[in-house]
């Protein structure tokens, strides 16, 4: 109830900040979604490939540019068919974040399909890392997500932001630039979610018994951090829409919670934050040398003693298995069963197991 009240009071103020910053929406498929639990859900800012006659819909496999578009889709893992559902376009400049009202928002359809028709009450939004082509994002990352968290699918929907990332991990700096650009497109999704939750008339008629988590892995953390920095620079207040924000393998700098560095505002968009630290993370060790600065998921926050109680830091180094080390200790979100259970199901006050 407090969250709804906050949204009702704050979101109208956003509409007065920059009234010209709007989102145009277009339905591409209004048919009811299948109740098949194997269908993945994602949204992407990649460029849509013009399909030839008889060809399936797909997106640019390698794409680094900002599009000002978000496509919301379902994906059939068996037939590998992409079902375009909806497109949202930001009509203001590339770097400006939307603040105006959103007509015909896709969020209402998501609520109807998943909450009303399927009884799903938990929504987990995921911003993955870079070094992923589009094919790898949906056929590897999303497939493993559905498989490894299969026991949760009856009550939880996993929705992935398949952002325009670099296709090779070695091209690290290009991946950083792609995260910077994709942060601008992520503003479309975040504003639509905030506007949906602020619709007091809708919630008077529908049950507000849903929860939202945001999970960022690897460079997805940096994408979120850049989004927060730019939003603060534009003077747009944050809205507490998430019950928990979870930072895994964070490639954000170790001072990310310092004033003006982005994550100092995380508790303004979520009730609590969980940060996992693995001191045996190979890719983050390489990132440390490339940036000449410690990484949040490797060494932890520099100002850890000054963090509020709602931000919990858990070191998971002792739980990294030999299997995790085969991927240099960076892929435990989709590999380590002990940590997977803890990430989704445990309270922040719960201690991690002392060993595997």
Give each language-model segment a name.
Residues 1-6:
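Bacterial N-terminal signal peptides that target proteins for export
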Residues 17-21:
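Sec/Tat signal peptide C-region and signal peptidase I cleavage site
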Residues 109-162:
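Short, surface-exposed "cap/lid" segments of acyl-processing enzymes
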Residues 186, 216, 220, 224:
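Gly/Ala-rich beta-loop-alpha elbow adjacent to hydrolase catalytic centers
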